Amino acid sequence: MSQRGIVLYFQVHQPNRAKPYTVFDTGIDHTYFDTASNAPWDNKAVFLKVAEKSYRPMNALLLQLLNTYPDFRVSLSITGVFIEQAREWAPDVLEGFKRLVETGRVELLAETYHHSLAFFFSQAEFERQVKQHEVLMQETFGVTPRVFRNTELAYNNDLGQWAESRGYKGILSEGWNPILEWRSPNYLYRPYGTSNIALLLKNYQLSDDIAFRFSNRDWPEFPLTANKYHTWVNQSLGDQDIMNLFMDYETFGEHQWEDTGIFNFFSEFVGSWIREYGNSFYTVSEAIDTFEPKEALSMPYTVTWADSGRDLSAWTGNKLQQEALRYVYSMEDDILRTGDESLIR
């Protein structure tokens, strides 16, 4: 009988923030990004700040846990944009991720290169970015990901079927109650209309207890200790298969600052979980190889892990956003015809 276990997945991304740019700058100022002002949109300053608060200490903690506990596992997805920034401004951060992958117990997942929602607007652009990301993972880490994760965990039936058609063995999604209804997120599922790919669902309640509520002093469960959280995971998982805890890497140190105790909490929880008989950690692929999907699950409309609506409304919720997206994608063919990689990017 397979041991029940936790699947830890962290998303690693840092966007390129556009600087303030008005209609009067059009045709005059062709520099859209800032890396020298120390303003909130200074991409270099932001990256270096988060590297110090989050990336370096979390990389060090994960490596320590991997060295301490042979059964510890974790899965990551790292965008191409993040790797570009790390190479330029903090190469040691990228080396830290390489050391994690070299342990053989950290799995890298596939995604879009630019943290893009292109799947919902341009299949060609989406597939171009996925391929670009795949090449980067091979060049940087020497691995070819076999499980797909879309930006913001955005998922629907069409994406699940696409992932199977491209040979992926699994795909991730938000385990949103209105979709699950009576079902539990603590099993593998089969994407609707597929036969050879697994769907892993985020347990959003327990994931978000760490990601969003950990340091909230108005939360009735504050403070969250490792022992309390261990009890909650035990109660939720019971005799089911897997607990999928999915969150941003920056949860540790940036969203939840070091002085909240987040790093100690995580270390203590990992140790207590492993020490309890019958518990395991799995990478995403190991979970897929270990357990059978419980049933097919249909998501006819798009679900994400963003905001309270768990949909695309954060990016497409008003007319201005919709028109901007329409206009950008209307230029796709013209831009591609230029062959100018700096423009295409």
What are these regions (language model features)?
Residues S2-S54, N67, Y187-I197, L201-Y204, ...:
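Active-site and substrate-binding clefts of carbohydrate-active enzymes
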Residues V93-A110, V143, E164-L201:
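Acidic, His- and aromatic-enriched active-site or binding-groove loops in soluble protein domains
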Residues V12-P15, G80-E84, Y113-A118, L153-N156, ...:
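Short, solvent-exposed loop/turn segments at secondary-structure junctions
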Residues Q123-E152, W232-F246:
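CE4/NodB-like, metal-dependent polysaccharide N-deacetylase domain
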Residues K131-N186, T251-F269:
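Catalytic domains of cell-wall/extracellular-matrix polysaccharide-remodeling enzymes
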Residues F119-F121, I179-Y187, D209-A211, P293:
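Short, charged, surface-exposed secondary-structure boundary motifs
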Residues Q3-F10, Q14-S122, R146-R149, K169-E174, ...:
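Short, well-structured secondary-structure segments
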Residues N59-L63, L94-K98, E127-M137, G160, ...:
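Generic structural signal for well-ordered alpha-helices
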